[in-house]
């Protein structure tokens, strides 16, 4: 090869070399540029790949953690599955037991349906009985209203009769007191007349004393006292009888009666019997032998028959008999007591009938008046019928009155004891005993 400094041909060779060199340079530059650009791209891709590797590493760590967690979850799920299987076994056994119970319940349901049909029939029967009982209850209410009306009517009737009895007793007492006053005045007048006659007869007997026969039987003073003492003995007894019979259970009237009896004249309370005993004894000793002395005759009446018959007809044989409560006066209180007793017996019979219709129903079984239900028997037997104690006593008293074997006296004593009460209280007590 020739160096650069040698001589060459001018115009061809250098330009070709330069062109080739330029082409090579261009190619190399292009290659460099392409390689450098590719290198940059590759670097970028490497960086991206490194980032992806990092991300994948992070994701791998996460996945590993998640895998471990999932493994734990799998273990727990396995345990839960095992537990669920055990629960399933238990539930299957329970289900079988429930199925058995369901079968038994179905059997019981069938039985209950059969029982329901019977119970519906019983309910229908009980409804019919309830309707009958309601009708019976309404009938009992109607009877109760009727009994209450009868009760009020009987109470009013009893009060009215007791009031009438009280008025009649007051009228009879007033009449009796007027009769006593009239008899007292008559007795005083007759006593004055007898004193005058006895004084005149005493003078005539004093003249004829020596001419009287001596064979007259001596009458002792006790006989004279017996003839004269009944006035003093029977007068208080008459007061007591008037007080016992006349009041008829009126306390206020009884006090008035005692006050009026105390206001009687002194001649009625203390008759002059003791003062005339000596004179009567003298007149009796001078009686003739042929004329006996009557027990009810006054001492001066026999002399009046011998000497003055006209005066003996005007004057009674014994003036004290008008005051002494004799058989006539005793008969009047007896009539009053008999009428009162008869009225009380009639009331007792009415109350007894009311009682029987009140406490017994149509089947002759006792009924409670407050609740309207039948009372139970004593021993639970159908043959035994319960009775009230008041019914027994009323029936015994009624039987004793019908038999007449002494029970009437007890009933009369009870009635007299009840008549001494207030009429209103008597009526209430009698009616409460009946109810």
Curated annotation (Swiss-Prot):
GO CC terms, sorted: Golgi apparatus; membrane
- Give the main localization category: membrane
List, as start-end ranges, the regions of compositional bias called Acidic residues: 398-417
- Residues that the record marks as modified (N-acetylmethionine) are 1
Task: Provide the membrane-side ranges marked Cytoplasmic in the record.
Answer: 1-14
Topological region Lumenal: 36-435
Taking the record's annotation, the residue ranges forming a coiled coil are 35-194
The way this protein sits in the membrane is described as: Single-pass type II membrane protein
Q: Which UniProt keywords apply?
A: Acetylation, Coiled coil, Membrane, Phosphoprotein, Signal-anchor, Transmembrane, Transmembrane helix
Does Acetylation show up as a keyword for this record?
yes
The residue ranges crossing the membrane are: 15-35
Region (Disordered): which ranges?
191-239, 271-435
Modified positions (Phosphoserine) in chain numbering: 232, 365
Comp. bias (Basic and acidic residues): 191-212, 223-239, 343-361, 425-435
Please give the InterPro entries that the UniProt record associates with this protein. Answer: GOLM1/CASC4
Q: Does the keyword Phosphoprotein apply?
A: yes
Q: Source organism's superkingdom?
A: Eukaryota
Ranges of compositional bias, category Polar residues: 282-294, 302-320
State where the protein is found.
Membrane
Give the record's family classification. Answer: Belongs to the GOLM family.
Q: Which PANTHER family match?
A: GOLGI PHOSPHOPROTEIN 2/GP73-RELATED, PROTEIN GOLM2
The entry's protein name is Protein GOLM2
Q: Which organism is it from?
A: Mus musculus (Mouse)
Tell me the classification of the organism that encodes this protein: Eukaryota, Metazoa, Chordata, Craniata, Vertebrata
Q: What gene name is listed for this protein? A: Golm2
């Amino acid at each position: 090869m020739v160096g650069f400094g040698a001589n060459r041909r001018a115009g061809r060779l250098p330009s070709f070399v330069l062109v080739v060199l330029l082409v090579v340079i261009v190619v190399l530059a292009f290659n460099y540029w392409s390689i450098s650009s590719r290198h940059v791209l590759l670097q970028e891709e490497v960086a991206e790949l490194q980032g992806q590797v990092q991300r994948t590493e992070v994701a791998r760590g996460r996945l590993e953690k998640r895998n471990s967690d999932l493994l734990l979850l799998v273990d727990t799920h396995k345990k839960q599955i095992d537990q669920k299987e055990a629960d399933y076994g238990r539930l299957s056994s329970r289900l079988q037991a429930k199925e058995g119970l369901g079968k038994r319940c179905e059997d019981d349901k069938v039985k209950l349906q059969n029982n329901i049909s019977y119970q519906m029939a019983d309910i229908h029967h009980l409804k019919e009985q309830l309707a009958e009982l309601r009708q019976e209850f309404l009938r009992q209410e109607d009877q109760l209203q009727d009994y209450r009306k009868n009760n009020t009517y009987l109470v009013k009737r009893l009060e009215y009769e007791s009031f009438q009895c009280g008025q009649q007793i007051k009228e009879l007492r007033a009449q009796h007191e007027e009769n006593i006053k009239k008899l007292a005045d008559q007795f005083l007048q007759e006593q004055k007349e007898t004193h005058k006659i006895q004084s005149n007869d005493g003078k005539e007997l004093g003249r004829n004393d020596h001419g009287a026969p001596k064979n007259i039987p001596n009458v002792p003073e006790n006989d004279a006292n017996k003839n004269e003492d009944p006035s003093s003995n029977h007068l208080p007894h008459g007061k007591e009888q008037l007080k016992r019979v006349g009041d008829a259970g009126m306390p206020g009237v009884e006090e008035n009666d005692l006050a009026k009896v105390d206001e009687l004249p002194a001649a009625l309370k203390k008759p002059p019997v003791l003062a005339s005993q000596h004179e009567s004894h003298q007149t009796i000793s001078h009686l003739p032998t042929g004329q006996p002395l009557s027990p009810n005759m006054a001492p001066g009446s026999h002399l009046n028959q011998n000497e003055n018959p006209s005066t003996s007809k005007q004057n009674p044989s014994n003036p004290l008999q008008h005051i002494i409560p004799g058989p006539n006066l005793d008969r009047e209180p007896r009539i009053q007591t008999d009428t009162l007793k008869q009225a009380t017996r009639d009331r007792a019979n009415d109350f007894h009938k009311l009682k029987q219709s009140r406490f017994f129903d149509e089947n002759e079984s006792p009924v409670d008046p407050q609740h309207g239900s039948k009372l139970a028997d004593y021993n639970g037997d159908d043959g035994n019928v319960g009775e009230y104690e008041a019914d027994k006593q009323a029936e015994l008293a009624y039987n004793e009155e019908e038999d007449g074997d002494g029970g009437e006296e007890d009933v009369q004593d009870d009635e007299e004891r009840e008549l001494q009460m207030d009429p209103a209280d008597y009526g209430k007590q009698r009616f409460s005993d009946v109810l």
